[in-house]
């Protein structure tokens, strides 16, 4: 039986593009692990994706994951079937343009294949303490830098 893991993620950018940070919280029972990172030149969408990628990468065995993000970009790609269409169309959008951030989408597809993942949309900058903490981790990463 797979462990049930709850993940919250967020990405932030100072300028878009600009310096970026990401934050994630992984929760299993009473255990909480916080992750964060920095990129000197990126976009908000890349940081949102990176947060989810790094959180899933931190799991050492196949898990049942509920992943919460305030990014419609990340959540809708899975829930609305965007990724299925993009892969079928050789990474082209419906308008026949190249899908942005293909490198990251390929990574997250590989990681989600290892786990049972459900994506959930949360309202950003609201009263969700876990989303707010991830936002704080992402913003702190921008300030700290490596």
UniProtKB/Swiss-Prot annotation:
Residue stretches spanning the membrane: none
Superkingdom as given in the UniProt entry: Bacteria
Cofactor(s) the record lists: Mg(2+)
Cofactor binding description: Binds 1 Mg(2+) ion per subunit. May bind a second metal ion at a regulatory site, or after substrate binding.
GO molecular function: magnesium ion binding; nucleic acid binding; RNA-DNA hybrid ribonuclease activity
Span of domain RNase H type-1: 1-143
Binding site for Mg(2+) 1: 10, 48, 70
Catalytic activity line of the entry: Endonucleolytic cleavage to 5'-phosphomonoester
Primary location: cytoplasm
CDD domains, sorted: RNase_HI_prokaryote_like
This protein's UniProt keywords: Cytoplasm, Endonuclease, Hydrolase, Magnesium, Metal-binding, Nuclease
Subunit structure: Monomer.
HAMAP family the record matches: RNase_H
Name by which UniProt lists this protein: Ribonuclease H
Organism whose genome encodes this protein: Chlorobium luteolum (strain DSM 273 / BCRC 81028 / 2530)
């Amino acid at each position: 039986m797979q462990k049930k893991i709850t993940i919250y993620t967020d990405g932030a950018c100072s300028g878009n593009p600009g310096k970026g940070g990401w934050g994630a919280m992984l929760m299993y029972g009473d255990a909480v692990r916080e992750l964060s990172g920095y990129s000197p030149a990126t976009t908000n969408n890349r940081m949102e994706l990176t947060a989810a990628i790094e959180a899933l990468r931190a799991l050492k065995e196949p898990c049942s994951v509920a992943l919460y993000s305030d990014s419609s970009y990340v959540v809708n790609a899975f829930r609305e079937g965007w990724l299925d269409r993009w892969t079928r169309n050789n990474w082209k959008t419906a308008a026949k343009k190249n899908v942005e951030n293909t490198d990251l989408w390929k990574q997250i597809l590989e990681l989600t294949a290892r786990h049972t993942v459900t994506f959930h949309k949360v309202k950003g900058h609201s009263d969700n303490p876990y989303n707010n903490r991830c936002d704080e981790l992402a913003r702190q990463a921008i300030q700290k830098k490596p």
